[in-house]
């Protein structure tokens, strides 16, 4: 009977210790988030919470047009000439370098 009381006391002391540790860590986290830091400390210790976009050096008029006007279709030979498909050969089968 003495062993069961010792086990019960040990379990309750462990749970009490864990509860106190959890409360302490919660308070520590809460206080660290609410206390304002100086500029030097905030940049060296943690990432900033609020991110601000910098002004662009490129004017907005030079951005890419996502919906360009319809262009005339090029023939297959002009596309081959443009990308040089006739100039190189693509081997088929497994990669000979890795074998």
UniProtKB/Swiss-Prot annotation:
Q: Where is this region: Disordered?
A: 60-99
Q: InterPro entries, per this entry?
A: CLE41/42/44
What does the UniProt entry list as the effect of changing residue 95 to L?
Compromised interaction with TDR
* Signal peptide start and end residues: 1-34
Q: Where is there biased composition of kind Basic and acidic residues?
A: 80-89
Instruction: Decide whether keyword Signal is in the record.
Output: yes
> What's the name of the protein?
CLAVATA3/ESR (CLE)-related protein 41
Organism expressing this protein natively: Arabidopsis thaliana
